Amino acid sequence: MCLLGCTALFLSGCSTGFLGLAPLGDRKEYVRARNLYNEQQYQQAANELTQYIYKAGNVKRREARAYRLLGMSYEQLGQLDKALEVYLEALEFHPKNVPLLVAAAELYQKAGLVDRSQELFDRAQEEDPHNAEALTGQAENYRSFGFYSKARTYYDQFFELNPQADPVYRARYASTFLNQRNYEQAFIHITMALAQDNSVPDYWLISSKAAFGLGNYKQALADLDTALHLAPERADLHLYKIMGLYQRGLYTQSLQETRQFLTSRPKDPLALLFAALNEWELGQKKTARFHLKQAAEINPDSFVGQVATKLAQEWK
């Protein structure tokens, strides 16, 4: 009885902090900060979390989840440097925490520091080989380096674990084939993405490029028109259609599209170049030289400017 009584007395005198648990008051502070975050009051959440984290004198009591939420708050505020500082500090105390590793890796990726991003994604996979964010993050790193086959090995693992994954990943997978001019596989996989979501213009653009590569020009132009219907404000889609029509030898249609485009963007050098190319093919030599001169003068050192300058010399 004496031993049991002493044990009970000892435990009753210990704080929850001594036992490694967050005291009740602390838990309430975290919940309050989390609620602020959920209410999109990110600055207030960051203030609360900063106080919550740094009031703990013992760094071992600084919770990984609090660091993660603080970093997320800074991300929402657009303060990515601060967010990364938070994650890196947290990893000093929680070096094997997968959400923190992934969060820091993603920010390095956004900053273009791919080597550092790869290192942290590798560490995350050591702790959790099936982590979806680490697999797709590493796939994107290899894709950005141009190692498309290597990127697909990570995507293959990801799809095996997540067969109903968001179609954006299937579209990125398709783009790796497109970049290697494997148009058949690119078309197959972008069609799968479109079956899940046909409202994304970029999916239709990938489909159009794959169809062009396969020689299915009617399909390619139809897909491009769908993309333009979804995003009529996108200049890149209009320019791609202009180029596609020109490559098909449909000079009148291409010129019509070009002139319409130039009404809103009269100094677009690529559009001016294709106006000149189409006009030249249609025998409108004078206007072709005029537009070519404009294209060359806007930015002479650019690729388009150099091409226009060279053509201008040949068309004299």
Residue ranges and their predicted role:
Residues R62, A66, L100, A134, ...:
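TPR alpha-solenoid repeat register
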Residues N38-E39, Q76, K110-A111, S144-F145, ...:
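Register position in tetratricopeptide repeats
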